[in-house]
Amino acid sequence: MALPKDMRLKGHRTFNYIHKNSTIYHGKLMTFKVARSNPEILFTHKLTNNSNKFRMAIAISKKVSKKAVERNKLRRILQEWLLTNIKKINNHKPYWLLVNLKFGDFCNDKSRLLEEFQNLMFKSHLIK
């Protein structure tokens, strides 16, 4: 299941902001870049104030897998974990999260991938 639209990060300005203003947490399989949210950067056509919430993006390089099917499978696995554990996320502090997967052969090891993801979520203080 995909992330809801109000939880997705997109746009060059948003990613440039995250790369410049983020705290980086490294793991063996992935890297987290966590930045405080800045709603002024987002282009929203609606006048609602839902842009100051937790948002995330998952970037998976072709170095991880040449097949888009496998990269999308990894993305769906991480998004599914996030949606099932959404209540644990500290929503009182609006953050933007960019997840970059490092290259390696872990496409078949779902448990290792999810364990690393959860450890980095704790390490970055995004979940309690």
Swiss-Prot record:
Keyword Glycoprotein (UniProt): no
Role this protein plays: RNaseP catalyzes the removal of the 5'-leader sequence from pre-tRNA to produce the mature 5'-terminus. It can also cleave other RNA substrates such as 4.5S RNA. The protein component plays an auxiliary but essential role in vivo by binding to the 5'-leader sequence and broadening the substrate specificity of the ribozyme.
Family membership: Belongs to the RnpA family.
Gene: rnpA
Quaternary structure note: Consists of a catalytic RNA component (M1 or rnpB) and a protein subunit.
Gene Ontology MF term list: 3'-tRNA processing endoribonuclease activity; ribonuclease P activity; tRNA binding
Catalytic activity: Endonucleolytic cleavage of RNA, removing 5'-extranucleotides from tRNA precursor
Organism field: Prochlorococcus marinus (strain MIT 9215)
E.C. number: 3.1.26.5
Any Pfam family: Ribonuclease_P
Keyword Secreted: no
Disulfide pattern: none
Name of this protein: Ribonuclease P protein component
